[in-house]
């Protein structure tokens, strides 16, 4: 899960204030449909994730935020742990959203995959059959992998999932092996990783799915 939605407070009957770190036209279309169906106006305050969280914290109970939308469960879990959300789960959400895509204080509205990109010219497709994240530690990929820095929330959530499934020690060993397999020091965003493969700097990249579609559009 990667794009998440969290209730902060109670809106006025005729409007709802959304603090959003997302920047997609599809969201605007969703808000417009909501207003057309309910008559409730949607006010959107856009900004960077950290800036929005800082504002909400500083404003406290006086915050005008009703809903907070951001990317990745990792961000929401940390904000939730700070006590910034309230239990607002409705029966509708429980019916529509699978339990692994929500908590008692937030729910997912979309999901994205963090996948493995590869160069078809330099990588044999047979080497990728059944490939898992864990396989990125295989020495055969030495000098061939690019991925964002470890402080990126997408990578942090990926590591968290590996810890959940494989334990801390195994994940620590995996991380060290992946570092040894890197084609370069981590830099740039997800698009930069994909471009590195296209440019021949690496054979394998880890990045979210939608970036390729955006780059091709």
What are these regions (language model features)?
Residues 1-7:
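Bacterial N-terminal signal peptides
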Residues 13-78:
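Early extracytoplasmic/lumenal segment of secretory-pathway proteins
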Residues 21, 25, 64-201, 212:
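Extracytoplasmic ligand-binding site segments that recognize negatively charged/polar headgroups
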Residues 30, 173-174, 208:
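Short amphipathic alpha-helical coupling segments at ligand-binding clamshell hinges
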Residues 49-50, 190-191, 209:
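Conserved glycosyltransferase catalytic-site signature
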Residues 208-217:
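A beta-strand-loop signature enriched in Asp, Gly, Thr, and Trp
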């Amino acid at each position: 899960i990667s794009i998440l939605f969290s209730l902060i407070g109670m809106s006025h009957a005729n409007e709802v204030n959304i603090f959003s770190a997302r920047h997609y036209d599809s969201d605007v279309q969703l808000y417009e449909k909501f207003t057309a169906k309910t008559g409730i106006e949607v006010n959107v305050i856009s900004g960077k994730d950290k800036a929005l969280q800082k504002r909400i914290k500083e404003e406290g109970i006086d915050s005008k935020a009703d809903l907070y939308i951001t990317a990745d469960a990792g961000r929401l879990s940390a904000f939730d742990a700070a006590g910034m959300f309230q239990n607002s789960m409705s029966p509708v959400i429980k019916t529509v959203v699978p339990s692994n895509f929500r908590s008692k204080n937030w729910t997912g509205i979309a999901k994205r995959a963090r996948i493995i990109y590869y160069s078809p010219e330099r990588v044999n497709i047979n080497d990728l059959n059944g490939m898992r994240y864990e396989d990125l530690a295989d020495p055969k990929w030495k000098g061939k992998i690019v991925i964002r820095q470890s402080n990126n929330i997408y990578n942090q959530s990926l590591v968290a999932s590996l810890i959940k499934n494989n334990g801390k020690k195994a994940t620590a060993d995996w991380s060290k092996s992946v570092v040894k397999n890197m084609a370069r020091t981590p830099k740039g965003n997800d698009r930069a990783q994909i471009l590195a493969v296209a440019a021949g700097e690496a054979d394998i990249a880890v990045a979210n799915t939608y970036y390729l579609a955006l780059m091709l559009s």
